[in-house]
């Protein structure tokens, strides 16, 4: 089972990927995590990535794709994998296709997490996190008993920079610019499957499992 998850920040890709890894016993692969792991382990591509990172420069596609290739060649990917948040562009999708071809693999399904941007913004902008214990709250959907105070430990609740409305709007704009062509690309490959990501976590999970198993069947 070789999957790609597409969706805007906050759509629940990571949560669903984590649940699927337990169901199907395949690894969840996040580019941010494997980039950090490659740098820490000093793999050939990790060493190259660190050179760019030390200069404060963006890690180029060629290196990112190389790190993804290193990860996909690992033994635990033999039965499948879930790519979470990669590829982000058509150029990366083309490179991924070549990498997988060289490994004798191919993408089976690209799951697109469909969300209403207004609802998504409300979800994310309302998040609050405890500085002390890390527990998460939501000002509307899961408010603390006392405004600004953690129910669990009494710590201060704050809004992360990534959850601020101006930041989220910029991230969503970038996502739309990059991903609209990518969705068209995968539609052309007949791999794109859409799920309603605004439903409860368990319902989204059922959608994905049903979709994957029906397509496999």
Swiss-Prot record:
Subcellular locations according to the entry: Cytoplasm
GO BP field: AMP salvage; nucleoside diphosphate metabolic process; nucleoside monophosphate metabolic process
Enzyme Commission code: 2.7.4.3
Family: Belongs to the adenylate kinase family.
Subunit structure: Monomer.
Job description of the protein: Catalyzes the reversible transfer of the terminal phosphate group between ATP and AMP. Plays an important role in cellular energy homeostasis and in adenine nucleotide metabolism.
Annotated GO CC locations: cytoplasm; cytosol
UniProt catalytic activity: AMP + ATP = 2 ADP
Entry-linked InterPro entries: Adenyl_kin_sub, Adenylat/UMP-CMP_kin, Adenylat_kinase_CS, Adenylate_kinase_lid-dom, P-loop_NTPase
SUPFAM superfamilies membership: P-loop containing nucleoside triphosphate hydrolases (SSF52540)
Chief location of this protein within or outside the cell: cytoplasm
Region of interest: LID: 126-163
NMP, as annotated region: 30-59
PROSITE patterns in UniProt: ADENYLATE_KINASE (PS00113)
Protein name: Adenylate kinase
